[in-house]
Amino acid sequence: MRLLPMKRIATVFPLLIFALVNLPIPSVAGQFTVTTVYDGDTIKAQGHDIIIYVLLAGIDAPEIAFQEQQGQPYAQEAKRYLEKLILNKRVDIKGYGLGPYPYNHLIGEVRLKGTIINIAMIKNGLAEACHEMPPDGLNIAPYREAEREAMEAKRG
């Protein structure tokens, strides 16, 4: 067996690392158990011998008070409702990439028994459809429709 010269390894290795780092995150992350709900749109889940932090895709829930930052109205209600829906339950998470630095959470759509939890948060008036550019591959139309329905029903 012939060994590669060091110069060739030194050239190929950085390219390999670059390729691995820039691989897209798989579209489907799989089934996980939700272990923590931080607020109305951020969770921690465990499964497949890993722990992931997930920012619910396509929604924006009220922010909870943190350090010197004041909380927004209905933040605790949104957190409690999300806990009621999915805490300690096995969910399917479909990933759409990573969120911005410094958190780099997986941006994901969470399903429980066929219900898209992200949309359920909007329908119940505890989150709004995200008005920024949605992640690639996420169909934002049902989110905006849920928001319209919630507003007409005066929820949230």
Language model regions located:
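Small beta-barrel nucleic-acid-binding modules, primarily SNase/OB-fold domains
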Residues: R2-P14, A19-G156
